[in-house]
Amino acid sequence: NYIHEWLFHKMAKELGIIGLNYKFIKVSINGTDRGLYALEEGFGKELIERSKRRNGPIFSFHEELSENAFGNWYQDNTNLEVYNKRYWNKKENYQILKSASNKLNNFFLGNEKLENAFDTEKWASYLAICDLLYTYHGTYAKSVRYYYNPIIGKFEPVSFDGHRGRNHPNFNKLNKDYNNQIILDYLYNHDDNFFPDTALGWLNLFFLNKDKKLNENFYKLYIEKLELVTSDNFLNTFLSSRKKEINQINSHIYSDYYLFDNLLTRGPGFYYFSKKDLEHRAKTIRTKIRTESNNYPEYIQAGIENNKLIIKNYLRHEHYASIIVKELICEFDNIYSLKKL
């Protein structure tokens, strides 16, 4: 995955998310040069402790499950797999494993609230990173890993499978197929040219409450994290502090015979790293989430509830910024029922 997955793990660590050690090495087998390989860390105790966490179980879904998650395939925790199974099945560790497994199972079955089961700040950061870097493969339910933090009793994401797919080429003014969508576009206004499957559908568990209404707390966190990772200060600092490493890695990739990902096939292709592409992506996201308009009267509602004037702001999903009410004029002596402004 060229340098994209390396950036993915580095940015995850930058935001306090558990990220894998990931580097590039030249491989020779029995004296035969095999070219450049990516070396990726596994999911052991060392990963957790290096990330300054208490040792806890890490879960994944069976890789062979359909990518059309979140669908009808989730029935119970038989779909879950824990790393270092022998260790966690020991008598002295089993209670932590059981508690964690039950909580994750109940969350996916809709019996546990997001805030009670997941560290929402870490997950909002993780989704924001995947939006910025186009690493949507890492947001699939079967791709991301779930670390149970026994201190807070909640799950954190472990960055994994941060693959930037073939339908996310570098920005170019002549490229009419440039993908400017973010996760909310997929969930509410998605274009099947860019998201032909339903693999991100499970993220509704983050953005919608059980009554299918917007989870405003998580939504606000997600927008805050998007603002952070797309800010000029964050992106420039992140890239400039790693400029030497980025140049070294790309020089090795450019000199290697790399294969291009065509989803179902692979073959020779063209790759180059573009800082301007990331800068354009960040600007595109900022524009989306800051969109303001005064032309949505049907989405603002006012009324009296418990002797208080209540202004309700209804989110219109093709725009992500809150609608700001700058002035309220009441032309009635009394408000007897809810009246739309």
Tell me what each language-model feature is.
Residues 15-20, 32-125:
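Internal "kinase-insert"/substrate-recognition segments embedded within catalytic cores
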